Amino acid sequence: TDVYVTGSNAYLLSSELATLLSGRYVEISILPFSFKEYLSARKIDFSNKYLNYEALFFDYVNETSLPKGTEIREEGMDKIMEYLEAIYTTIIEKDITQRHQINDKRAFNNIVKFMASNIGSALSPNNISKTLKNDGQTIHHSTVEKYLDYLIESFVFYKVNRFDLKGRKQLATQEKYYLVDVGLLNILMGKDRISNRGHILENI
């Protein structure tokens, strides 16, 4: 008998299943749609030689790569924004802050928005802390580091480490962070996302 376990990050992370189930489980990570999967979900006819891939890619980048987005897109962008807002509220503002008992939600949200506005840039907890301090908000770099870990373990962001080709080893600082879905930039950055096209493409 197969048993499928899903749930809120506020109560259980997939990494804890190994302890609770004593290794008798298989973890399947489900990612948002790739561009090809997105087109398939929209039932696009690939045999059409006049297919406007540029317009379709624009939709993919500017809406959302989450599966539900293809179901509700005919209802308009407002519906997609409502859906993304609900995702953000549930996962970031509720699940993570509740699970880790984060009291300073303003500071946490500022870090999320800072990371979103700097996707594809080399970052460290220390320079994030310094930048926020210059903007009038003091957050210790160790707190920033914890918040980054929470966002990664909840699959909101992915971290890519730098690699020293000469020494053939990963470097411990100045990592890059990418959003699981660039559609979340609609919520986190609004119209400002337009100026970040290069990093958005890098994220994809």
Predicted regions and their residues:
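Loop/turn-to-beta-strand initiation segments
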Residues: T1-Y4
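Interdomain motor-coupling "hinge/lid" segment immediately C-terminal to the ATP-binding subdomain
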Residues: S8-A10, S14-A122
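Conserved beta-strand termini and adjacent loop/short-helix elements that scaffold enzyme active sites
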Residues: T6, I30, V160-R162
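Accessory nucleic acid-recognition modules appended to NTPase machines
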Residues: G76-I204
